Amino acid sequence: MPLHNLTRFPRLEFIGAPTPLEYLPRFSDYLGREIFIKRDDVTPMAMGGNKLRKLEFLAADALREGADTLITAGAIQSNHVRQTAAVAAKLGLHCVALLENPIGTTAENYLTNGNRLLLDLFNTQIEMCDALTDPNAQLEELATRVEAQGFRPYVIPVGGSNALGALGYVESALEIAQQCEGAVNISSVVVASGSAGTHAGLAVGLEHLMPESELIGVTVSRSVADQLPKVVNLQQAIAKELELTASVEILLWDDYFAPGYGVPNDEGMEAVKLLARLEGILLDPVYTGKAMAGLIDGISQKRFKDEGPILFIHTGGAPALFAYHPHV
């Protein structure tokens, strides 16, 4: 088996059973294409989401190193920070979060509701900064200060997106391949591409397990020119960790994230409303709404390689709906 080296890495089990892979009958009828969805929005901690897969590996490494504090960074409405804080609470660890306000809003819901509200429930120590201009350096500086206070910090990068964390999505590719085997031949897979770990992990896993399926990353924060090296660098780092080759071309669409990261747009919000009304499934304004807008437009514009079934990776994020009201 090509991914046997995954078992070499310490891993905590937070998710348990595979997340559902479901057919969307009403949405498929609406689009005239078979659409399936991988429900990583229902992972069983802190209102779900994809980062829990990464944290199974990252938190295991933190415990191996003897850490008593998890440190990470993100936007005020970061899904990753929320899930990291929940994992810290579950493991009895302290959590320090370095947060920015990337959209410069003073709206009370954004500043206090949604993911930010949940951080308080998890007893997270919040440190604000003007902007995460160099998050790796800023996290190291924060870790130095936390260590000086007598803690043993473990730094988790933005999005949990390093080679170790991204192994969670190599593992996810294995899960997807097993669920599809003998049931459906997926032609294309669509995922939001942000901090790049989910996209890169899937790219490595699917190349070896479902090589006939194309993987499309819909960017949520950057142009293709800026996002491509992030995904490729992680793809190669993951492959090196697993002693695999990774030669599949990284495919990115950057037509759907304007006006910028964390700012809702009309097509993304229409996608959120459409899936809610047709299937009772909640997307979010920052990641999955924009990625689903890409899927919908990609069908309309015939951007996919053929007319076969499409799998959408639902990475979660519904808590942000409350923060972005009244945009929603």
UniProtKB/Swiss-Prot annotation:
- EC numbers for this chain: 4.4.1.15
Question: What is the scientific name of the source organism?
Answer: Escherichia coli O157:H7
Q: Which family does it belong to?
A: Belongs to the ACC deaminase/D-cysteine desulfhydrase family.
Q: Does the keyword Lyase apply?
A: yes
Cofactor field: pyridoxal 5'-phosphate
How it assembles, according to the record, is: Homodimer.
List residues, modification N6-(pyridoxal phosphate)lysine.
Answer: K51
Protein name as it appears in the record = D-cysteine desulfhydrase
Single GO molecular function: D-cysteine desulfhydrase activity
Known function? Catalyzes the alpha,beta-elimination reaction of D-cysteine and of several D-cysteine derivatives. It could be a defense mechanism against D-cysteine.
Kindly list the biological process annotations in GO that this record carries.
D-amino acid metabolic process
What reaction(s) does this enzyme catalyze?
Answer: D-cysteine + H2O = hydrogen sulfide + pyruvate + NH4(+) + H(+)
Keywords (alphabetical) are:
Lyase, Pyridoxal phosphate
NCBIfam families found in the cross-reference section: ACC_deam_rel, PRK03910.1-1, PRK03910.1-3, PRK03910.1-5
| HAMAP family referenced in this protein's UniProt entry, alphabetically | D_Cys_desulfhydr
Q: What is the lineage of its organism?
A: Bacteria, Pseudomonadati, Pseudomonadota, Gammaproteobacteria, Enterobacterales
